């Protein structure tokens, strides 16, 4: 995973290897993992502020939809696009389910979502931390690196390294936190 995020190996190859390791894991274990997930610092603040400002929020992840949907539900994110685990008889099969949400797919999802919502790419902001986020960040008006790998930080329009996700508000031009009702 780390090598793929640094851009050193192919994401699809890394993903297939990770999924194969999950063969036989029961969904009860996935549920336990969900219960233990912690949100990034500032996640609630940024999503709440963006919603107050009228943004449509989308979680585009190269991770698993099983977990991404849980996080999105906790935060009130509008939509989720992530990789689906193939589950049979209550356990992960270890086989990949296509399409894989890799860098190219992330960019396609962002472009399609903007088109579907009737907004220009000049109104799109993408936040990422790994090399597979670079294609979507490149097509957005603003690509923000969040505690990112060096390759991502070098190519981003802005970087948030010291604060939590609420620091993205500053990159959007909001110098202070927006009061949240």
Where are these regions (language model features)?
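Long, charged amphipathic helices and adjacent flexible linkers at domain junctions
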Residues: 11-17, 179
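C-terminal cap/substrate-recognition subdomain and adjoining C-terminal extension
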Residues: 24, 31-181
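Conserved phosphoryl-transfer catalytic core
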Residues: 1-8
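Short, surface-exposed acidic
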Residues: 1, 27-30
């Amino acid at each position: 995973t780390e090598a793929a995020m640094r851009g050193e190996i192919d994401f699809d190859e890394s993903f297939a290897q990770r999924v194969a390791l999950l063969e036989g894991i029961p969904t009860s274990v996935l549920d336990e993992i969900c219960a233990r997930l912690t949100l990034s610092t500032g996640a609630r603040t940024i999503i709440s502020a963006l919603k107050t400002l009228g943004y449509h929020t989308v979680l585009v992840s190269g991770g698993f939809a099983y977990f991404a949907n849980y996080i999105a539900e906790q935060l009130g994110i509008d939509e989720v696009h992530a990789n689906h685990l193939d589950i049979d008889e209550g356990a992960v099969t270890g086989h990949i389910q296509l399409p894989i949400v890799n860098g190219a797919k992330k960019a396609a999802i962002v472009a399609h979502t903007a088109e579907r919502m009737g907004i220009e790419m000049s109104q799109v902001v993408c936040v990422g931390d790994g090399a597979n986020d670079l294609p979507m960040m490149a097509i957005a008006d603003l690509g923000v690196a969040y505690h990112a790998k060096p390759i991502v930080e070098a190519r981003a329009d802005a970087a948030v390294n010291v604060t939590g996700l609420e620091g993205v508000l500053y990159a959007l031009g909001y110098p202070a936190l927006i009061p949240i009702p």
